[in-house]
Design a protein with these regions (language model features):
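Conserved acidic donor-binding segment of nucleotide-sugar-dependent glycosyltransferases
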Residues: 317-319, 323-330, 339-345
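Short hydrophobic beta-strand element within catalytic cores of glycosyltransferases
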Residues: 303-306, 316
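N-terminal strand-loop element at the rim of the active site
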Residues: 5-13, 23-73, 154-157, 239
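Acidic anion/phosphate-binding donor-loop and adjacent secondary structure
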Residues: 128, 156-160, 166-167, 174-193, ...
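Acidic donor-binding loop of glycosyltransferase active sites
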Residues: 91, 260, 275-289, 302-303
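Short His-centered aromatic/hydrophobic patch
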Residues: 95-101, 119
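A conserved mid-protein helix/loop that constitutes part of the nucleotide-sugar donor-binding site
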Residues: 13-21, 201, 208-224, 243-246, ...
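Active-site donor-binding acidic/aromatic loop of nucleotide-activated sugar
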Residues: 240-245, 258-267, 273, 323-324
């Protein structure tokens, strides 16, 4: 099966890392088209996955108005025509983001190729403007053969926004457990590299630096924890959120935490860094569609605390495979960090259970098989659920 993958971003976020894992299986019979250049192209090339950058970024943000969307049509139409021409060489179009859905839906009409939409977002007011919610739902309902949701939370939000339930199927992100378990051997070298003492309890936060990711909550929580508890913030600002980084650094300075908080920026050795931590925290203030870092931490054998909202609640069983904390509450977060700090044996045992759970439930091989079956059905029945709409 030949697949044309579409993604709007040149920067590797969660949706892009998921696409990387999927495309790797089809690398000898696929093409990944990006709407902007960046590190994601380099990452695809490093994995021998064919990639082509088609255009500069479309000028539509998650909260943009319909007028701004219309103004971008000068870019949209040429891009759609390029994709339509390319897609005639492939069996199906696989749109991995919302802007890719817009382009892919129009291109699929011209090329008569079935469209698959991989939904990595929660279509809610916290994440999208009402206009963009309507655009996504309308295009998916009308043109997609199937909507692959990355969690039950994403699927439920799609249906609540008007999406057809019969179109959607939930397929979680897949992971290669061996890649993360190998990182455990790097725990001591990494801790030595950063000068962590044996007594230091290191809390890791892994995501792009953005207000809704909640790094400021972890920084505030540290003020309620023992002085031997420190934090590393791994990730960089994307999408024009550099001001938030300065706010975080000022917060650290104002709270006299300069010696307890390290900003590491973007790192490619995330698994090694996770394995070096005593705890990984996920602090998103809005519901997370999935939460890859949660599963990655589990696979590394590192205990994890996650915000109790969205897809994260499907990944963590409180007190069994990790801990859930009320979003936006630094005091509750500090309480759980203290709990893990005071009970190392219990924390390690829970981390072991989580590692087993993640290895069994999110194995990339099994996820690949689920996706392959769905894509085969799309190729054999290209109209999918939409066959009843014609």
């Amino acid at each position: 099966m030949k697949i044309l993958f579409l993604d709007q971003s040149g920067k590797p976020g969660g949706a892009e890392l998921c696409l990387l894992d999927i495309a790797r299986k089809y690398r000898d019979r696929c093409l990944v088209c990006l709407f902007s250049d960046g590190d994601f192209r380099t990452l695809l090339e490093a994995n021998q996955i064919p990639v082509k950058v088609l255009a500069t970024p479309l000028g539509i943000s998650k909260d943009s108005s319909f007028l701004i969307g219309l103004l971008s049509t000068g870019q949209l139409i040429p891009l759609m025509l390029k994709v339509a021409r390319l897609s005639r060489q492939y069996d199906l179009i696989y749109a991995n983001t919302q802007k890719a859905l817009v382009v892919g839906a129009l291109a699929s009409v011209l090329s008569r190729r079935p469209l698959v939409y991989h939904l990595h977002d929660i279509l809610s007011p916290e994440h999208f403007s009402p206009t963009n919610q309507r655009i996504a739902v309308t295009l998916a309902n009308r043109f997609a053969a199937v909507v692959i949701a990355n969690s039950q939370a994403s699927q439920s939000a799609f249906i609540a926004a008007g999406g057809q339930a019969k179109l959607s199927q939930v397929v979680y992100n897949g992971f290669n457990p061996s890649l993360y378990q190998a990182a455990m051997s790097q725990r001591q070298p990494i801790r030595q590299e950063f000068g962590f003492t044996p007594q230091e309890f290191v809390v890791g936060h892994f995501s792009r630096l953005a207000p809704w990711k909640g790094q400021h909550l972890l920084i505030e929580a540290l003020t309620h924890c023992p002085r031997s508890v420190s934090a590393i913030l791994v990730g960089a600002a994307l999408f024009g959120e550099e001001d938030y980084v300065q706010q975080l650094k000022q917060q650290v300075k104002d709270l006299n935490l300069e010696h307890r908080v390290r900003f590491l920026g973007f790192r490619s050795d995330v698994a090694d860094l996770m394995a070096a931590c005593d705890l990984v925290v996920h602090t998103s203030t809005a519901p997370e569609p999935f939460g890859r870092v949660i599963i990655e931490a589990m696979l590394c054998g590192t205990p994890v605390v996650a915000a109790a909202a969205g897809g994260a609640m499907e990944l963590v069983e409180h007190g069994v495979t990790g801990w859930l904390v009320k979003p936006g509450d630094p005091l509750k977060l500090a309480t759980i960090i203290q709990h893990c700090y005071d009970r190392p044996n219990l924390t390690i045992e829970i981390a072991k259970q989580a590692q087993i759970h993640a290895s069994q439930s999110f194995d990339l091989g099994e996820i690949d098989r689920q996706l392959a079956q769905i894509l085969l059905q799309v190729r054999e029945h290209p109209n999918g659920a939409n066959s009843t709409n014609d």
